[in-house]
Structures are given as C-alpha cells and as structure tokens.
Amino acid sequence: MVERNGLAAAGPAVVTAADVVAGHVTLDVSCLDRVYLNGYVAKLQTPGGVVYFFRDHRGKPIVSPALFEPIGEKFRKDIRDWAQANGIPVIRFTAGQRKAEVMAPYLEAAAAAGRSQVVAVGCAQEFQLVWTARKRDTDPGGCPQFSFTKEQRRVSVFYIYIFDERMGPGFIKICTYFPYPVKAWVNGHEWAKRQAMAAGIGFTALSNGFASCDDPAALQAICDRFSPGTVQVWFERWMARLPLPLTSADRDAGYWWELSMRQTETSRTLVFDDDVHARAFFEALLCENMDLGRPENVELLFRRGQRLGRPTLPPAGGGFKTKIDRYCDLVTLNVFYRNSRLKQYLKDGVALRIETVVNDPRDLRCNRQLQNLPELQDKARAINARLLETETAGQGTALVSPVIERITRPTLTGEGRKAPALRFGDLRSRPWPARSPPCCSRSPASRTRPSAA
C-alpha cells in the first residue's frame, strides 16, 4: 500500500511488553540490589610498591617474603581474640556450604534486636590473588634479592558478617595474606527499607524488594539517594571497629583500601494488580522472547538502544545467548552480553523483576571505581527499561486485559444460563475487543484490523 504522499505505509505496530503492562502495575520501583565490591590498597599493587612499603615505610633493610607471615599471624590472632572478647561466634565454613544460609539465623536475630553489631565471623580457605616471591640468582656473599609476582594461592579469609541499623545486613571479607585484598557486600533494597521506615512510609516487603507502598514517589526518591557515599560511610564505619592487618601509621602514609565495583545488580520491580495476571503474563512472555540473546537484540539492549551499523562480535569465550534457569519453582530468563547479563523472573509470584547484573563495568563503558556507581546505575536502568520495549507481546500476554478475559472465559447470562467462552484467536472473537465501549481497557491484540464477521 502507498500513502498519498508517496511513502509506503508502515506495517502494523509491534506490541511490546511495555504496552501490555501499562495500566496493570500498582508499583514500579527501580533500585540497586546487591552491590559486591573489591577493596584494594593501590600502593601495594606493583612489585616496586611492595619493596617501598617494607624498605622505606616500615624500615626493613631486606625485603623478603618472610616479612609477610608475621603480619598475617598477628592479624589472625587479633581477630580470634577480638571475637572471643566480644562474645562473637566464630564459624568455620566447610566446602560446598552456602554461607548465606549458615549466617541467616544470626542476621535475623540481630535484625529483630534492631542493634548494629557484628553478628558472626566466618573462616574459610579460598583462592586469592596474593604476592609470592622467588629468590634471584645473585652473589651468595651479597644481600639476597627477591622477585615479587602475584599468583592465586589458597589462603585463609575472614568473613565479618554485620547487621547495621541504617544499611541492613552485609559482610566484609578480609584476606589474611599480603596485600590483604578485601571484599564487601551490601544490598540497596535493605538500605531503602530502613530509610523508608525512618521516614514513616508504610510498605509491604517482598523477599528482596517492595510489594506495595503508601507513597511510591517518595520510595523511588529514597532509592535514588543510594550513592557511593552511602557505601563508603558504611565501609569506613565498620573498618574502624575491626582488627586489621594495616595500622593507623600505614593509613597515614597512604596505605589503605579503596573500593571498586566487582558486581552490581540494578533492579526494576513491577508489581501487578493481580497475581494471576502476573504469572500468565510472564509465562507467555517467556515463550514469545526466547530469541532475546540474538546479536541484533543484545545490541539494542546493551548499546544505548541503537544499532551501530556493523556486525556485533560475540564476546570472548562464547557467543550471545539466551538461557532459561529453573530453581525449584522459579524460572529465570537470562540474556548474556560479555561478562554481564540481564535477568527477568517472577518475584514471589506477584511482581515482574528485571535485573541488569554487571560483572565488569567496562561492559557498559564505565570505570570500576566506586565513584562511578551513579553512571553505571543510570545505564543499567536504561537497559532494564529497554527490555520491556524490546520484548514482543503475543496472544498469551493479552490475558492481562480484562476485556480479553471476559471474552475467553465462560460467563453467566442474566437468566443464569452459562455462556461458553470464545477461544482466543478465533475469527468470531477477534472483533469483540474492537467493538467494546471506549471506557473499557483494550488488549494490544485488538489493535489489529478486525476480521470480517
């Protein structure tokens, strides 16, 4: 068909998931979820930095690996003595144990008490990237010299599990071997819950999020306030209370931990007005969008929503892909891109959850330093929004429309007689949504041209 202006008429508009959910969501909240951080001492990341630390800062004339062990031994002893003096349980993790499940009772008890505290210390043996040394071939009569390299070694680590009345649950993991790398974990939803309670905003919680809220706009404003400073203040507050391998003199000389992003989860939660609608919509959405991992779709999702006009190269180690994970009764749709992925699943049976999981900020053209968290979150939120705009909505997803439900489900007439349902897609049922009164909500399926009666 040709328009009167000579241009070809556009085909029928593609109905997206964003079109279908409009008008059927009672709460739409975007918030950082899990934030997993690396802590590193910048001045100890090179062999020259190691030599300078011991020789020039600590005054050791011969820099050798023998200097590492006394610091680690003292740190391990200080942690155990500190835990015993404060009545903090020390738990040794075994291989294959789920640490979160082991520590959950301790964190729940601390949350019930409502008091900030270290709830437990976990001990484990894990592979860490640490400094090792090899003796150089030098004059036997002269001073020994060593070459320092970083290698993966199985060493002891301490998990310090914390309940903070402002942040919620979290942990700090400290390696006991030089250069003492650190990991830290917090949850943005848990922080937002405590801020909402402090502000007097009523809400109903999901297992990790919000199911309802008295003031959605105020809740979203709280979620938007989660910043690098929020995490940095929490980290410094608890590091000041813990025994550490580095001293205050080391800190004054610039030897202290800086934080960078190891993994971030930026989520969007859409709570439906009816859990029946939520499940039906999600199941149909899965069937319609099994090709999201194709290069052309991944390009739309992860690259600013624009096609770049050149072939999209697959990431190293594998191509683009879509993967369906099933754990118990939870089904998750995963779309992979480089080291990151986009997840979509049904949260607690009532909400559609979308999460952009970034394992390398460079995938989104961001730097790793914690100060870049706002930029990374903005880009991840845009990806979450583009997912619903990219997903196509087929016939099954139209079940969220009350009009379609009335057509495709049996009803009772005014005389009490049962009227049979019309099968969705049947020629007789297609004109019905188009003939419905203007006040009724229309299904996206009704936007197509009605067939002849």
Describe the residue ranges of each PLM region.
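Short acidic, hydrophobic short linear motifs in intrinsically disordered regions
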Residues: 442-453
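Extended, non-transmembrane interaction/recognition domains
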Residues: 146-405
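Short, leucine-enriched amphipathic alpha-helices that occur as contiguous helical runs
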Residues: 425-433, 448
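Short, locally clustered residues in the helix-turn-helix/winged-helix DNA-binding domain
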Residues: 434-441
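Amphipathic alpha-helical protein-protein interaction segments
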Residues: 422-425, 441
